[in-house]
């Protein structure tokens, strides 16, 4: 069976690997000249199913728990399993209690344990939540590793060229994200913004989430001395540079986490349009011989492995798990 995958972001690359593992001939097509230059390029890369349950449905936890093992096998050496630390300023202690009430898989940590986990945060926060079973990766390195692995497996890539002849393929798997807004019923775009900061005055070993009733922040360590900041979710499909308000909120929150971030260099800013359905859960939608994998919202790296597996099961006509959003939430 010959499969055409449209879209070379995280959804398309994970689907390509899953289908290749099952012995299918896979071709990946993208109008962009390089892989992963859409929303995937600006992702945080947090493999945090328990934390994400705070604002997501149970399906995100159910589908996301296998992500760490999948990425660890698919991209050896790129997954860091140091957990996630969640903290809040003393004045926002209620936010920490609220977060705890909506999640599981954590243990309460006091000031001493916060200092043990993250020495540079010593004395800054009295209470926190530690989600020991979570991890993170660098999305850009992970996608590059998947690309290399797929090339070695014989996957053909058509990047940046004219439209490909779809008639010669038995199945088409469309992973083009927000490009399907207006075509897939209920799909919308949600703008996400991010910053990269550079400083050697602060060191973090894991993603840290700083809770605030208006400006929640996550900060994810990359290579030494570099940090990715994110968390904006703006209900618009308008692309373009990061807004002044978002940048100020990011920097204020980073400064609240540690004052040394006030002297950091801003080395990159960016925005991505995340595809989302009304319930913010991904779906698998069939139209003739095309299977759409879409709607991962802010959970692309967390949920794409599970969605790829479910889509491959469907293509092979296997029984699909009841956790499959396609069964419960078809478009």
What spans do the regions from the language model cover?
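C-terminal catalytic lobe of FAD-dependent flavoproteins
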Residues: 264-331
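Short hydrophobic core segments
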Residues: 6, 29, 168-178, 308
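Active-site substrate-recognition segment that forms the wall
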Residues: 17-21, 47, 78-79, 176-288
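N-terminal Rossmann-like FAD-binding beta1-loop-alpha1 element of flavoenzymes
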Residues: 2-27
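Short beta-strand to alpha-helix junction loop
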Residues: 55-65, 87-94, 129-145, 241-246
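Helical element adjacent to the flavin cofactor pocket in flavoenzyme catalytic cores
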Residues: 129-167, 171, 175
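Dinucleotide-binding Rossmann-like beta1-alpha1 core, especially the glycine-rich loop
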Residues: 44-117
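Glycine-rich FAD pyrophosphate-binding loop
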Residues: 20-40
């Amino acid at each position: 069976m010959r499969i055409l995958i449209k879209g070379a972001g995280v959804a398309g690359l994970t689907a390509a690997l899953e289908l290749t593992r099952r012995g299918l001939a896979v071709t990946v097509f993208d109008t962009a000249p390089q892989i992963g230059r859409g929303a995937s390029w600006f992702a945080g890369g947090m493999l945090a199913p328990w934390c994400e349950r705070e604002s997501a449905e149970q399906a995100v936890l159910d589908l996301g728990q296998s992500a760490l093992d999948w990425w660890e096998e698919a991209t050896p050496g790129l997954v860091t399993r140091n957990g996630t630390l969640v903290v809040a300023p003393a004045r926002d202690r209620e936010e920490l209690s609220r977060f705890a009430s909506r999640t599981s898989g954590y243990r309460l940590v006091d000031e001493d344990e916060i200092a043990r986990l993250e020495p540079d945060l010593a004395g800054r926060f009295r209470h926190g939540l530690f989600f020991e079973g979570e991890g993170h990766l660098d999305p850009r390195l992970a996608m590059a590793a998947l690309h290399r692995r797929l090339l070695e497996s014989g996957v053909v890539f058509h990047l940046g060229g004219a439209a490909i002849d779809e008639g010669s393929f038995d199945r088409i798997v469309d992973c083009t994200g927000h490009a399907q807004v207006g075509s897939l019923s209920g799909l919308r775009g949600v703008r996400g913004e991010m910053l990269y900061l550079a400083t050697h005055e602060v060191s973090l070993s894991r993603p840290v989430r700083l809770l605030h009733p208006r400006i929640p922040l996550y900060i994810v360590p990359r290579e030494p001395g570099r940090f990715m900041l994110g968390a904006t979710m703006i209900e618009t499909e308008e692309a373009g540079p990061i807004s002044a308000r978002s940048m100020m909120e990011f920097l204020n929150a980073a400064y609240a986490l540690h004052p040394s971030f006030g002297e950091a260099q801003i080395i990159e800013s960016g925005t991505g349009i995340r595809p989302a359905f009304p319930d913010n859960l991904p779906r698998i939608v069939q139209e003739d011989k095309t299977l759409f994998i879409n709607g991962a919202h802010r959970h692309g790296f967390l949920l794409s492995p599970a969605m790829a597996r479910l889509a491959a099961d469907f293509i092979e006509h296997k029984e699909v798990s009841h956790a499959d959003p396609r069964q419960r939430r078809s478009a």
